[in-house]
């Protein structure tokens, strides 16, 4: 049962809130497009839980060893996974939180196509990603104004916080 990496999905239609076109960016990372990279188990059987993975990196980058390898490990446990490439420096709060909440909503919006259970969406994060995962769990909502994805809940059904930054 080998997992497949589905096409990377932009979190936002067009540019993320508050971003500018690459030619107007004052920092290379300012023009980066936040994405969700799904790691899906083969179709068949009942819908499975899905875990959104938030790599750490001090909000200045994203640690590669806390991204794709973790998603593949989750696949080995029988879970779908999706790695969220959220905005980091020069972006500050609330940009990473907006991206992580959007990733949860987007996973819910694609649940049928991904054979995922929209009622069993979890989030896992390391270090700064753990802080972000805790924030998503704490500030989850039932949907906000906006497009069809925005109107879906950002509440998670499970939280896994791996050495989260919870005190400064």
Each language-model region and where it sits:
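N-terminal cap/lid segment of alpha/beta-hydrolase-fold proteins
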Residues: 1-45, 49, 93
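A fold-wide structural signal in alpha/beta-hydrolase
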Residues: 50, 75-85
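Primarily recognizes the serine-hydrolase "nucleophile elbow" in alpha/beta-hydrolase
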Residues: 102-168
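N-terminal carbohydrate-binding/catalytic regions of secreted carbohydrate-active enzymes
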Residues: 35-40, 60-66
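Catalytic nucleophile-loop/oxyanion-hole region of alpha/beta-hydrolase
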Residues: 62-64, 69-70, 84-118
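Active-site loop/turn elements of alpha/beta-hydrolase fold enzymes
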Residues: 56, 79, 86-88, 164
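Short beta-strand element of the alpha/beta-hydrolase
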Residues: 47-57
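Hydrophobic/aromatic beta-strand patches that form the interior of the parallel beta-sheet core
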Residues: 9, 52, 82, 160-162
């Amino acid at each position: 049962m080998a997992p497949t990496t589905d096409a990377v999905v932009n979190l936002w239609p067009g540019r993320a809130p508050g971003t500018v076109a690459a030619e107007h960016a004052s920092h290379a990372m300012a023009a980066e497009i936040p994405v969700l990279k799904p790691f899906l188990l083969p179709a068949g059987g009942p819908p499975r839980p899905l875990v959104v993975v938030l790599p750490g990196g001090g909000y200045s980058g994203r640690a590669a060893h806390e991204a794709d390898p973790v998603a593949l490990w989750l696949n080995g446990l029988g879970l779908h996974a999706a790695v969220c490439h959220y905005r980091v420096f020069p972006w500050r709060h609330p940009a990473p939180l907006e991206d992580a909440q959007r990733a949860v909503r987007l996973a819910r919006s694609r649940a049928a196509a991904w054979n995922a259970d929209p009622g069993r969406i979890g989030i896992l994060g390391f270090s700064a990603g753990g802080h972000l995962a805790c924030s998503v769990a704490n500030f989850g909502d039932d949907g906000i104004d906006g497009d069809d994805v925005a109107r879906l809940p950002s509440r998670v059904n499970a939280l896994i916080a791996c050495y989260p930054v919870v005190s400064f």
